[in-house]
Amino acid sequence: MEKIPLIVIAGLTATGKTDVAVELAQLVNGEIVSADSMCVYKLMDIGTAKPTKEQREAVRHHVIDVVFPDEDYNVAMFQKDATNAILDIYKRGKVPLLVGGTGFYIKSVVDDIEFPEMGDSKQVRKKLFDELNNKGNMYLYELLKEIDKDAANSVHPNNVKRVIRYLEIYFLTGKKPTEFLDKVRRKGSERYNVLPLCFIMEREALWQRIDQRVEKMFDMGLADEVKMLLDMGYSKDLKSMQGLGYKQVIPYVEGKISLQEAKEELKIRTRQFAKRQRIWFKYQGEFVFLDVTGMRFEEVVKKCFELCKSVV
């Protein structure tokens, strides 16, 4: 069976993945499949740093604006949507590019991970968020510790999103999160001929780009976007609204902190996110790391294009 060429552009936030991918897609006659867990949400454009209208007109994008902010979406659903998009792109004689910074989303496609069936998590998640609001994050963390010490030891108590995700797995499957995840089997990249690029950047340069991105987001109307979502009735406790770029801005919209405090909080959280990304990608092993520090945009595109010749 002929393998499908798949160009992966992964890496740290704010390293210019989207801009390079759009240019590269035009050079290789490709289309982009977004691998970003936040870009799947409709109405959430600025805080998710979605490709611009011009970029989406220049190159067709897939797996963007899939669900509304109060609808469920997870890695298994992404894998199905992304795989279907890749097959469709290839059948039409074009080259698929998988682009984004959500590592496990990328891995689910590239490694063709098999996910066990899970039930509807909406009601379970609502109950857990009610517990969070009424009893606090330490209550949930202690609950996780009782259920699965190994899972609890792998996550910080303040990482509420991850704690809740582990508890969801337990209440939906009846299994310890670590046991459940151990049964997620890797089948390997049998269907794809993959070029797995990963953009990295020196810390000081990346911090500067993150600061610039946050300032630009606020200039583009991030606070107005968050206010609009709240005014439309989307709860601040939703998984989507707890995402980076939204959770940090809600207190400002509610009048609890200043604009400058909101900006600083988002900058700090984005840096922390970039650190976690760096660690995750580093330990995957299969990526070709491309340090884009100080490189001009044209140089990055040219380098990627040269590397693409191995699969296209």
Curated annotation (Swiss-Prot):
One of its GO terms (biological process) is tRNA modification. The keyword Transferase applies. InterPro entries: Dimethylallyltransferase, IPT, P-loop_NTPase. The record marks 102, 125 as: Interaction with substrate tRNA. Substrate binds at residues 13-18. It catalyses: adenosine(37) in tRNA + dimethylallyl diphosphate = N(6)-dimethylallyladenosine(37) in tRNA + diphosphate. GO terms for molecular function: ATP binding; tRNA dimethylallyltransferase activity. Keywords: ATP-binding, Magnesium, Nucleotide-binding, Transferase, tRNA processing. It holds the Pfam family IPPT. Residues 36-39 are annotated as: Interaction with substrate tRNA. Its EC number is 2.5.1.75. Its cofactor is Mg(2+). Catalyzes the transfer of a dimethylallyl group onto the adenine at position 37 in tRNAs that read codons beginning with uridine, leading to the formation of N6-(dimethylallyl)adenosine (i(6)A). NCBIfam families: miaA. Monomer. This is tRNA dimethylallyltransferase. It comes from Caldicellulosiruptor bescii (strain ATCC BAA-1888 / DSM 6725 / KCTC 15123 / Z-1320) (Anaerocellum thermophilum). The lineage of its organism: Bacteria, Bacillati, Bacillota, Bacillota incertae sedis, Caldicellulosiruptorales.
